[in-house]
UniProtKB/Swiss-Prot annotation:
Source species: Glycine max (Soybean)
Tissue expression profile of the protein: Mainly expressed in roots, to a lower extent in stems, and at low levels in leaves and seeds.
This enzyme's EC code(s): 4.1.1.36
Protein localization: Cell membrane; Nucleus
Requisite cofactors: FMN
Cofactor note: Binds 1 FMN per subunit.
Misc. comment: The cv. Suxie No.1 (SX1) is more tolerant to salt stress than the cv. Tianlong No.1 (TL1).
Protein name per the record: Phosphopantothenoylcysteine decarboxylase HAL3a
Quaternary structure and interacting proteins, as annotated: Homotrimer. Interacts with CYP2 in the plasma membrane and nucleus.
């Protein structure tokens, strides 16, 4: 046996000089056309962290699955109960919540924002959110039409998720996929990545490696 785990006098073991593991990032996409950038987002994070990905049924219309990093598993609603056979078997949305250090939804559609704010959990993604441990960081990067972004419901929903402790990576103003010009475009994958990584590393420094 390798000598990296000496036995204490009390019989307990303790790893010594073990290499720190990579951060575990759970990336999720909901049904916005900005999900065309999801594979790029996964590539950004996979160079730094262990990544698992979740997609809603609507987001699959836009995600190029062939462009996803080969080492990133993409979970869909079909996976939620496919491995569950009997009481005691693992439940995917619970296991993903346990696994992740940080969750990031990018893009966050108006529909999924409304579901989260209302506590709904009718797919894999929203079940993870409903079961999330809010002592762990959670980021969202909304993407929607300018009029949807400016809708009074959106303001109410953003207040609700802020009260949960979810951090907002705000949308940007540009020409949108629908042709309109205005605020509502998802932040660039590089911006989302740098925001989350800076947060993680600053917290790790403050807490000697723990976030």
């Amino acid at each position: 046996m390798a000598g990296s785990e000496p036995v204490r006098a009390e019989g307990e073991t303790m790893a010594v000089d073990a290499a720190p593991r990579k951060p575990r990032i759970l990336l999720a996409a909901s049904g916005s056309v900005a999900a065309v950038k999801f594979a790029n987002l996964c590539h950004c994070f996979s160079e730094w962290a262990d990544v698992r990905a979740v997609s809603t049924s609507a987001s699959l219309h836009f995600i190029d699955r062939a462009a996803m990093p080969k080492d990133v598993i993409l979970y869909t609603d079909d996976n939620e109960w496919s491995s569950w056979k009997k009481l005691g078997d693992s439940v995917l949305h619970i296991e993903l919540r346990k696994w992740a250090d940080i969750m990031v939804i990018a893009p966050l559609s108006a529909n999924t924002l409304g579901k989260i704010a209302g506590g709904l959990c009718d797919n894999l993604l929203t079940c993870i959110v409903r079961a999330w441990d809010y002592s762990k960081p959670f980021f969202v990067a909304p993407a929607m039409n300018t009029f949807m972004w400016n809708n009074p419901f959106t303001e109410r929903h953003l207040i609700s998720i802020d009260e949960l402790g979810i951090s907002l990576i705000p949308p940007v103003t540009k020409r949108l996929a629908c042709g309109d010009y205005g605020n509502g475009a998802m932040a660039e994958p590089s911006t989302i990545y740098s925001t989350v990584r800076l947060f993680y590393e600053s917290k790790a420094q403050q807490g000697n490696g723990d976030i």
